[in-house]
């Protein structure tokens, strides 16, 4: 009687081919995914890599603010923090604006529906009532699947999702969030950190000369 090993396994050939095809498909999928991550990463590792809309609906690249300190704020017109917060933002921008610093305001209506105005109306309201000169962008969503990508980056990188209006996030010249403040925190709590960051920017520019 011939040994069992002498009989050929006829079905092994097609199975091996199917396995090879499936393996190739899996490897291709993995490679495409890794390539996608490689190309996406440079566009999402900095706040300044995003584009947003201004109050008039025009596209603005945040790249123009790179190299400066930025205070990113979700603002609202009909909030109990509106008056004090806009005064604080105006003072900070007035004091540090000429020295590599910007306040970047993003209106949002998701917190107590306290921003019913249109983007243009918000800009006009802030200019007329508080004399602000810093950029006020298009009204956005911060919470949920329709959140503005630029602000979602702020939230994800800081691990601090705003719970109300006028949360303030300090972004360094490279586009990373380094500090945040809740709406009830006073100007005196923010000023030293902004001043320190601006001092570092000025010192670096002198060293690069």
UniProtKB/Swiss-Prot annotation:
It is an enzyme of class 1 (oxidoreductase). GO terms for molecular function: glutathione peroxidase activity. It is found in: Membrane. GO terms for biological process: response to oxidative stress. It is a single-pass membrane protein. GO terms for cellular component: membrane. The active site is at 79. The keyword Oxidoreductase applies. The keyword DNA damage does not apply. Its main location: membrane. The modification N-acetylmethionine is found at residue 1. InterPro entries: Glut_perox_Gpx7 (IPR013376), Glutathione_peroxidase (IPR000889), GPX_CS (IPR029760), Thioredoxin-like_sf (IPR036249). Keywords: Acetylation, Membrane, Oxidoreductase, Peroxidase, Transmembrane, Transmembrane helix. Its EC number is 1.11.1.9. The chain crosses the membrane at residues 18-40. Belongs to the glutathione peroxidase family. This is Probable glutathione peroxidase 8. The gene is Gpx8.
């Amino acid at each position: 009687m011939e040994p069992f090993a002498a009989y050929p396994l006829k079905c092994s050939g097609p199975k091996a081919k199917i396995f090879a095809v499936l393996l190739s498909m899996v490897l291709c999928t993995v490679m495409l995914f890794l390539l996608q991550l490689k190309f996406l990463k440079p566009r999402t590792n900095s706040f300044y890599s995003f584009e947003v809309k201004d109050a008039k609906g025009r596209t603005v690249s945040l790249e123009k603010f790179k190299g400066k300190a930025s205070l990113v704020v979700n603002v609202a017109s009909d909030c109990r923090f509106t008056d004090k917060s806009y005064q604080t933002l105006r003072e900070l921008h007035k004091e540090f604006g000429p020295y590599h610093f910007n306040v970047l305001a993003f209106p949002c209506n998701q917190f107590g529906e306290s921003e019913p105005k249109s983007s243009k109306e918000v800009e006009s309201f802030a200019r007329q009532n508080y004399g602000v000169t810093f950029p006020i962008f298009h009204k956005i969503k911060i919470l949920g699947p329709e959140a503005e990508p630029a602000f979602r980056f702020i939230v994800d990188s800081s691990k601090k999702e705003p719970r109300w209006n006028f949360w303030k996030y300090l972004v360094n010249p490279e586009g990373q969030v380094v500090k945040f403040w809740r709406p009830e925190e006073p100007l005196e709590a923010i000023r030293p950190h902004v001043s320190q960051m601006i001092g570092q920017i000025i010192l670096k520019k002198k060293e690069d000369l």
